[in-house]
């Protein structure tokens, strides 16, 4: 009997030291955004055709893919436009992987949206290898643009 009382007291004492901590999936307690891959980088109008403009500012040759197509090249200092048409949309709207040829460099994507023309400019640069790298531009069914 005495051991049950001691065990119960020890458990209650241990629980007193626990503090609630917000999980990663919870909204920020200060009402603002917390940076991370789960936050959209941009927003587009998903009721109109979307133009993705890829700008290669890495100093390296890149390759990118589109659903149902083979890899295409994006040479140093060039840009390519990818049209995402309404008829192409199923659950998610677009997933465009972009990598350096051979996957040898860490990349970073910066976004700029022209809401009048529904143009998303993706500026691709090199990033510090110690940071997480961007590998794909993803647009979901609500028009939110993410880097993964």
Residue spans for each PLM region:
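Intrinsically disordered, low-complexity segments enriched in small/polar residues
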Residues: 2-55, 99-148
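Extracytoplasmic
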Residues: 47-49, 57-59, 69, 77-79, ...
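Short beta-strands and strand-coil junctions in structured, solvent-facing domains, enriched
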Residues: 60-61, 145
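Mature extracytoplasmic domains of secretory-pathway proteins
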Residues: 61-107
